[in-house]
């Protein structure tokens, strides 16, 4: 879908809120890093660096202090380590013809050390977004205490109430193909500034996103390194949260609809007693959403 949308330049800025607060990195404590190392999932696989989570967990007491120093240095200088930006991609066959690439689901595996860096940052940025109330209440995805069930119950309740009142209900469901891959890095970094993440903090996210690479592993053989020019990092800790930030302002284009989001899965609902009028209203109200998609969802 992204490839079919005409990009609208800098129009995406018109949907963004005015900046009212500012985010600054806090110094990461040695205790936080130690607990993250201790809590690593030993069953997870390792990345291209071949450092297994079990090894990190087992050596937590020896490495937590130097690792804390490196993480804080990364935040202070706005530089994410290049060696942690290379992913190992394993294609998993789904169904159909094995000769078609679309019939495989890519599993991206990053360095286990990268997860420690990212969790430290995620803890801070999550607290900031919650404290400042920056996320739309219509987002149910990747948020503590919210589930797909909550989203579905809310939708069913609205439709039930409408039917009880003798109204028709119309819902439009959007499913963006490979949505996490359609994130434009330049647009995302600009959005972070609008949400108060600027200066060295924005530079860190710039470093985190850019110049990422991947190697595909098939039958024990690795491909050459391939550059990744768009999207949030697959298999990462910060990726889903960054996508929520990216899509957060879509509510500015859906004021006529009742909006519900679960990450990229979007439902838009309208009700009216007159069916013909309802369809007419829905067609007209969808135009601003199309404009938002044109302004935001694209490959660079």
Could you describe each region identified by the protein language model?
Residues 197-203, 258-261, 275-300:
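Polymerase palm active-site segment centered on the conserved acidic dipeptide of motif C
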Residues 86-89, 105, 139, 169-179, ...:
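Catalytic palm active-site di-aspartate
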Residues 42-51, 100-109, 150-190:
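Conserved catalytic palm subdomain of right-hand nucleotidyl-transferase polymerases, strongest
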Residues 179-195, 267-290:
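Catalytic palm subdomain of template-directed nucleic-acid polymerases
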Residues 1-102, 108, 112, 116, ...:
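Surface-exposed loop/turn segments and immediately adjacent short secondary-structure elements
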Residues 30-38, 66-73, 123-125, 151-162, ...:
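Inter-domain linker/hinge segments that demarcate the starts of reverse transcriptase
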Residues 121-139, 240-270:
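Active-site palm subdomain of RNA-directed nucleic acid polymerases
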Residues 176-261:
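Conserved polymerase palm-domain catalytic core
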């Amino acid at each position: 879908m992204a490839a079919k949308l005409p990009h609208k330049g800098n129009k995406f800025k018109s949907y963004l809120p005015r900046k009212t607060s500012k985010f600054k990195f806090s110094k990461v404590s040695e205790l936080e890093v130690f607990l993250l190392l201790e809590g690593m999932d030993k069953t997870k696989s390792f990345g291209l660096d071949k450092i297994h989570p079990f090894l990190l967990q087992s050596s937590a007491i020896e490495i937590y202090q130097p690792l804390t120093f490196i993480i804080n240095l990364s935040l202070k200088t706005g530089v994410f380590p290049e060696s942690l930006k290379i992913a190992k991609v394993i294609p998993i066959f789904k169904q159909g013809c094995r000769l078609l690439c679309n019939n495989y689901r890519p599993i991206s595996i990053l360095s286990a050390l990268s997860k420690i860096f990212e969790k430290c940052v995620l803890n801070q940025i999550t607290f900031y977004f919650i404290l400042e109330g920056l996320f739309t209440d219509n987002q149910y995805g990747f948020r503590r205490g919210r589930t797909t069930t909550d989203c579905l119950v809310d939708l069913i309740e609205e439709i039930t109430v409408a039917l009880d009142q003798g109204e028709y209900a119309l819902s439009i469901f959007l499913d963006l193909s490979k949505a996490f891959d359609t994130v434009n890095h330049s647009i995302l970094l600009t959005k972070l500034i609008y949400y108060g993440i600027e200066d060295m903090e924005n530079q860190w996210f710039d470093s985190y996103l850019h110049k990422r690479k991947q190697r595909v592993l098939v039958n024990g053989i690795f491909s050459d390194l391939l550059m990744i020019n768009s999207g949030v990092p697959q298999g990462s800790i910060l990726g889903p949260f960054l996508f929520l930030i990216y899509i957060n302002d879509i509510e500015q284009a859906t004021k006529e609809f009742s909006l519900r989001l679960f990450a990229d899965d979007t439902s838009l609902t309208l009700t009216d007693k007159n069916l013909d009028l309802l369809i007419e209203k829905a067609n007209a109200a969808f135009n601003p959403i199309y404009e938002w998609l044109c302004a935001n969802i694209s490959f660079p």
